From Swiss-Prot:
Name of the molecule in the record: Outer spore wall protein 5
Residue ranges, Cytoplasmic side: 1-8, 60-128
Function: Involved in spore wall assembly.
Upper lineage: Eukaryota, Fungi, Dikarya, Ascomycota, Saccharomycotina
Any single Gene Ontology cellular-component annotation: membrane
Membrane topology of this protein: Multi-pass membrane protein
Residue spans crossing the bilayer: 9-28, 35-59
Extracellular compartment spans: 29-34
InterPro entries assigned: Osw5
A Gene Ontology biological process term: sporulation resulting in formation of a cellular spore
Family membership: Belongs to the OSW5 family.
Pfam families: Osw5
Signal peptide: none
Length: 128
């Protein structure tokens, strides 16, 4: 072992430790910042998914409610179709359950020969 071995080893050790310390001064804050951002990403992803599920829950409930209200509104509109008569018929095979059977009134027929020609000519003159 030469007399320069110990000082050379000490120099390399001190140089290595000082470079490692300086590198850790730069790297550790970035690692910490990266850890915080990745944790926030995971947390916000969970919150986003949860809020989406809550919104979807309310959306589904309100769609069902609004469909019922729209059907009620449609039922209140006057119909352009002939009136339908409903009669209840007991089902033969299913006991007490009642089924609704709809009958449509006979459609009215208007033949071309029954329309007076004067009314057609008047309607053409009125439109001009």
């Amino acid at each position: 072992m030469t007399p320069w071995s110990l000082p050379q080893f000490a120099f390399h050790l001190v140089t290595f430790l000082s470079i490692a310390f300086i590198a850790s001064i730069f790297v550790l804050p970035f690692l910490t910042f990266s850890f915080v951002l990745s944790s926030a990403t995971v947390g916000l992803s969970f919150a986003s998914r949860t809020s989406f599920e809550i919104g979807l829950f309310f959306y589904d409930r309100f769609v069902i409610l609004l469909q019922g209200q729209l059907r009620g509104m449609i039922d209140q509109l006057p119909s352009n179709q002939p009136a339908k008569e409903e009669k209840k018929v007991k089902a033969q095979q299913q006991g007490d359950e009642l089924f609704t059977q709809q009958e449509q009134a006979a459609p009215s027929q208007t033949l071309g020969s029954t329309i007076p020609l004067q009314s057609i000519e008047e309607s053409l003159l009125d439109s001009t």
